[in-house]
Curated annotation (Swiss-Prot):
Source species of the chain: Phascolarctos cinereus
Record-listed a ubiquinone binding positions: 201
InterPro entries in UniProt: Cyt_b/b6_C, Cyt_b/b6_C_sf, Cyt_b/b6_N, Cytb/b6-like_sf, Cytochrome_b, Cytochrome_b_C_euk/bac, Cytochrome_b_N_euk/bac, Di-haem_cyt_TM
Membrane topology of this protein: Multi-pass membrane protein
Function: Component of the ubiquinol-cytochrome c reductase complex (complex III or cytochrome b-c1 complex) that is part of the mitochondrial respiratory chain. The b-c1 complex mediates electron transfer from ubiquinol to cytochrome c. Contributes to the generation of a proton gradient across the mitochondrial membrane that is then used for ATP synthesis.
Assembly mode: The cytochrome bc1 complex contains 11 subunits: 3 respiratory subunits (MT-CYB, CYC1 and UQCRFS1), 2 core proteins (UQCRC1 and UQCRC2) and 6 low-molecular weight proteins (UQCRH/QCR6, UQCRB/QCR7, UQCRQ/QCR8, UQCR10/QCR9, UQCR11/QCR10 and a cleavage product of UQCRFS1). This cytochrome bc1 complex then forms a dimer.
Misc. comment: Heme 1 (or BL or b562) is low-potential and absorbs at about 562 nm, and heme 2 (or BH or b566) is high-potential and absorbs at about 566 nm.
Name recorded for this polypeptide: Cytochrome b
Protein family according to the UniProt entry: Belongs to the cytochrome b family.
Residues that hold heme b b562 according to the record: 83, 182
Coiled-coil boundaries: none
Length: 381
C-alpha cells in the first residue's frame, strides 16, 4: 500500500501535500486556519449550489424566492442559514489567518503571501456582490452606495458605474450579472487556492520561532491531520450554533423588507466583516480620498514584505513589535465598531483617529520598532 500511495498518479497528488508532507514539529493551532478556510470554501460552494437551484435572479421574484427556499424547500432554511453564517465564519478564519501571517512573519514567503492577498480581494468581491442577491432594502441600497464609489474615478467614473449597473440604476440587469459573478467566483477562488498551496509547498511551512525548521520535521499525517480535524470540529460547532440558534444575529434587520427604491434606510452599512474598511472610507470627507483610503487599507498587505525591517522573522521574541501588533488588532476592532455607528460625533472623530493610526502603525511604527529591536540586540554603547 505504501508503494501504491507513492506511485499511483492520482493518489500521489494527494499524498505529496497531505500525507508525506514534511511539516515543522512545533507549529501551533494558529496554523489550522488554512485547512479551515478550505473547508469553509467547500461548505459555501455546496450550500450555494443548492440555493442556486431554487433562487431566481429577477427583481420581481428574488426576494420571494429566498422566502420560498426558507419555507417550502426541504431543509432550505438550514441551507440558507449555513450559507449566510458560513460567510461570517469564513471571514473570521480569514482574518485570523492573515493575523497569524503578520505575527509570525509568514509574509516573507512573498509569492504565497501575494496570492493570499489576491484571494482575500476575490473573497471580498464575492461577498460584496452576494449582498445584493436577496433583494432586500439593504441589498438594494448597499449595492447602490458601494457601486457608486466608482463614480469617484475621474472622467470615466459615471460611465463605469452605469456600465456595471447595466442601466441608470441598480435594477434587473445588475441583479442578474451579480448572481452570475457570485456563482463563478468561488470556482476561480478554488483554482487560486491550489496555486497558493503549490507555492507554500515549494518553501514549506513557517513556524512560531521563525527559524529554519529543516532539521526537525515530521510527516503531516497523522500528526497534523488529527490536529486539523479537531479545529474542523470546533469550527463546525460554531457554525452550527450560529445557524441553528441565532441565524439572524449577524444579518441586518432592513434586509427582511423587500427592496424599495423610494425609501432609503436610516443607516446604510455593509456586513460586519467589511465595517473596518467602511469606517476608513467614511472617515475621509472627500469621496475620491475615501475610496483611495478604502483600497489602501487592503492593498497595504502587499507592502508587508517590504516593510519588514527586523533581523528576526517572527514577533515571538520581539516585545515592542508584539505590543504594536495587538494595538493594531484593537484598532481594527474599534474601526469595525465605528463602521456600524451613525455618522455623528463622537463616532466621526474616533473613526478618523483610528483610520490614521491604522496606517501609521503599519507603515511607520512597526518598521521603526523592528529597527529599534535590531539595535537593542547589538547595542553600540
Amino acid at each position: 500500500m505504501t508503494n501504491l500511495r507513492k506511485t499511483y498518479p492520482i493518489i500521489k497528488i494527494i499524498n505529496q501535500p497531505f500525507i508525506d508532507l514534511p511539516a515543522p514539529s512545533n507549529i501551533l493551532a494558529w496554523w489550522n486556519f488554512g485547512s479551515l478556510l478550505g473547508m469553509c470554501l467547500m461548505i459555501q460552494i455546496i450550500t450555494g449550489l443548492f440555493l442556486a437551484m431554487h433562487y431566481t435572479p429577477d427583481t420581481s421574484t428574488a426576494f420571494s424566492s429566498v422566502a420560498h427556499i426558507c419555507r417550502e424547500v426541504n431543509y432550505g432554511w438550514l441551507i440558507r442559514n449555513l450559507h449566510a453564517n458560513g460567510a461570517s465564519v469564513f471571514f473570521m478564519c480569514l482574518y485570523l489567518h492573515i493575523g497569524r501571517g503578520i505575527y509570525y512573519g509568514s509574509y516573507l514567503y512573498k509569492e504565497t503571501w501575494n496570492i493570499g492577498v489576491i484571494l482575500l480581494l476575490m473573497t471580498m468581491m464575492t461577498a460584496l456582490i452576494n449582498y445584493v442577491l436577496p433583494w432586500g432594502q439593504m441589498s438594494f441600497w448597499g449595492a447602490t452606495v458601494i457601486t457608486n464609489l466608482l463614480s469617484a474615478i475621474p472622467y470615466i467614473g459615471t460611465t463605469l458605474v452605469e456600465w456595471i449597473w447595466g442601466g441608470f440604476s441598480v435594477d434587473k440587469a445588475t441583479l442578474t450579472r451579480f448572481f452570475a459573478f457570485h456563482f463563478i467566483l468561488p470556482f476561480i477562488i478554488t483554482a487560486m487556492v491550489i496555486v497558493h498551496l503549490l507555492f507554500l509547498h515549494e518553501t514549506g511551512s513557517n513556524n512560531p520561532s521563525g527559524i529554519n525548521p529543516d532539521s526537525d520535521k515530521i510527516p503531516f499525517h497523522p500528526y497534523y491531520t488529527i490536529k486539523d480535524a479537531l479545529g474542523l470540529a470546533l469550527m463546525l460547532l460554531i457554525l452550527l450554533l450560529l445557524a441553528l440558534f441565532s441565524p439572524d444575529m449577524l444579518s441586518d434587520p432592513d434586509n427582511f423588507s423587500p427592496a424599495n427604491p423610494l425609501n432609503t434606510p436610516q443607516h446604510i452599512k455593509p456586513e460586519w466583516y467589511f465595517l473596518f474598511a467602511y469606517a476608513i472610507l467614511r472617515s475621509i470627507p472627500n469621496k475620491l480620498g475615501g475610496v483611495l483610503a478604502l483600497l489602501a487599507s487592503i492593498l497595504i498587505l502587499f507592502m508587508m514584505p517590504l516593510l519588514h525591517t527586523s533581523k528576526q522573522r517572527s514577533l515571538t521574541f520581539r516585545p515592542i513589535s508584539q505590543t504594536l501588533f495587538w494595538i493594531l488588532v484593537a484598532n481594527l476592532i474599534t474601526l469595525t465598531w465605528i463602521g456600524g455607528q451613525p455618522v455623528e460625533q463622537p463616532f466621526i472623530i474616533i473613526g478618523q483617529v483610528a483610520s490614521i493610526s491604522y496606517f501609521l502603525l503599519i507603515i511607520i511604527l512597526m518598521p521603526l520598532a523592528g529597527l529599534f529591536e535590531n539595535y537593542m540586540l547589538e547595542p553600540k554603547w
